[in-house]
Regions:
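Small-aliphatic-rich amphipathic alpha-helix that forms the alpha element of a beta-alpha
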Residues: 39-41, 45-100
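Glycine/small-residue-rich phosphate/adenosyl-binding loop
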Residues: 1-66
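Solvent-exposed alpha-helices and their adjacent loops that cap or buttress functional pockets
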Residues: 30-33, 101-106, 126-127
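Low-complexity, flexible helical/coil segments
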Residues: 16-19, 72-80, 120-126, 145-146
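Short linear motifs at secondary-structure transitions and domain/linker junctions
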Residues: 12-18, 86-91, 109-110
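Short coil/turn connectors at secondary-structure junctions
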Residues: 34-37, 82, 105-109
């Protein structure tokens, strides 16, 4: 709840609508013990190329290769009729998780993927049209159209 309190406010300061939305968003955390498989994904930092380390901001590329891997795991699970959820919020407790699974010190916790049999299969998701978030050449250039 520390993350929620820091980013969205406490129960005392949140509107009723926001409380409902936060409760919906945190339902996964409250029922994680009911999910049969917890796939804890670690990244061997000794082989990671942090190409944006001098950018003066947190790295956005350091673990870039791990998320396509996770997506492939999720797609394979889906093909078998399984559902998945991914979260990175467990990283706040990396030291405790490291001790629990005895992960090496030079490995980083990338994500937790929950895998189980879904109560119902999700509908096909709708996506924003590509031209609403892509440009040609530069940000003030013409929109990219598919």
């Amino acid at each position: 709840m520390r993350y929620v309190n820091e980013h969205y406010g406490t129960d005392e300061t949140m509107s009723e609508d926001r409380k409902r939305r936060v409760a919906d968003a945190t339902r996964m955390a409250e029922s994680m013990d009911e999910v049969p498989v917890h796939l804890v994904v670690w990244l061997d930092m000794s082989v990671v190329a942090v190409t944006d380390s001098a950018a003066g901001r947190p790295s956005v590329v350091a673990g870039g290769s791990v998320f396509p891997f996770i997506q492939n795991v999720q797609l394979a699970a889906r093909a078998e009729g399984l559902g998945t959820r991914i979260t990175t919020l467990l990283s706040e407790e990396e030291a405790a998780v490291r001790a629990l699974v005895r992960a090496p010190q030079d490995w980083a916790l990338a994500a937790l993927v929950l895998v189980g049999w879904p109560v119902r299969l999700p509908k096909k998701l709708s996506r924003e049209p590509v031209e609403t978030f892509t440009w040609l050449e530069h940000f003030d250039g013409p929109r990219f159209t598919a």
